[in-house]
Amino acid sequence: MASYEENPQGISQADMIVAIPSYNEAEMIGYVASQASQGLAEYFGHSRSVLINCDNHSLDGTREAFMSVPTAIPKIYLATPPNTPGKGNNLRNLFEKVRDLGAKVVVVVDADVKSITPQWIKNLAEPMEKGFGFVCPLYVRHKYESTLASTIAYPITRCLYGRRVRQPLAGDFGFQGQLADKFLQCPVWTESSQNHGINIWMSTVAINARLPICQSFMGGPKVHRNEDPFAQLTALFHQVVGTIFDLMGVYSDFWRQVKWSKPTAIFGVSGEDVESPPVMGINENRLHERFTSGFEDYLDLWQQIFDQSVIHKLQEMRGLGMQQFSFPIQTWVNILFDAAVAYHQVSAPDRSTLLDALLPIYMGKVLAFVRKTERVSVQQAEELVENECMVFEETKPYLLSKWDGR
């Protein structure tokens, strides 16, 4: 796909790649490239390494900022054709380049990360020298950061495929070069997986490749450019959940055989104090408004998808005030499982409408999570997430009966 490549040092082989996908990141990419170069030089000086900027044909000077920053490690710039957006398309260029260069180890880091250090490269690459095929990061996170992972991506991935990968939507990860072929061969390559769905797509494909997977503690929070969490929520929700549901169809022979989940090895945890994550504010009124407005827009569709007992419970929740608002976990699990089955029963255009209808219910789930955890520690909030994951696993026979009865 790459329409443009700049490879001033003529690199034709590499053992290790650090890739930085980007779109209009001229402000930060030089810093990220510098930190990545230091990490490669300091911890993997024995390897033939290269930095690759996989870019969406940015027009803000990203290429110039990347190529001009002084680094000890050689650099390659790859760009998609003009007007071809999406991190997934950047990474598809990367997979092809990994194959061309014969790279054994690949690390990917986001271009806007302010908290990256050279240690990050070590943390994401070193486990692969110990035989792991895919490395997911573990950051110190605020309890309300990435509620999409806490309430959907983590519990569903864990329940379906039997691996406990806490942050499967993370944009930084490592993988063995041999996985590039698996990524290129995956039959699911949709608009969703080309965009926000790419991180969960990679995590899921890697789990199903049956290579050893681990998590690596990054030593602190991930700090990147501040954005309004609602600004891209609809697209993010559609693309992440749509990708999860799409992959359920491809990998059903595997996940239907998985009964319970197993812990995933964690690297890099020490007894040292770590920096606290930035404080996050949540607009509870906005969440409540989005939940209640869903009844006006989607009640008819909900009644087609969900059992009547679920509809009654949603109506009951609608009558709760903000202070008393709650969302029974069993109801939430049944809703997600019913939605996943319905997704595979409708045409492609109707799938988008189904995801639209699920979004306000998700808003209610996030609100309930906030209400339940606002006075507890991050650790206690994590315990709640773990307990809810067990309900997903215990309810899997319900999903199987619905799936097989389609």
Q: Language-model segments: what does each one mean?
A:
Residues 238-406:
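Terminal low-complexity segments of carbohydrate-biosynthetic enzymes
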Residues 116-138:
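Conserved donor-nucleotide/metal-binding helix-loop-beta segment in metal-dependent transferases, i.e.
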Residues 135-147:
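Short beta-strand-to-loop element that shapes/binds the nucleotide-sugar donor at the catalytic cleft/hinge
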Residues 102-114:
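Short beta-strand-to-loop acidic/aromatic patch adjacent to the donor-nucleotide binding site
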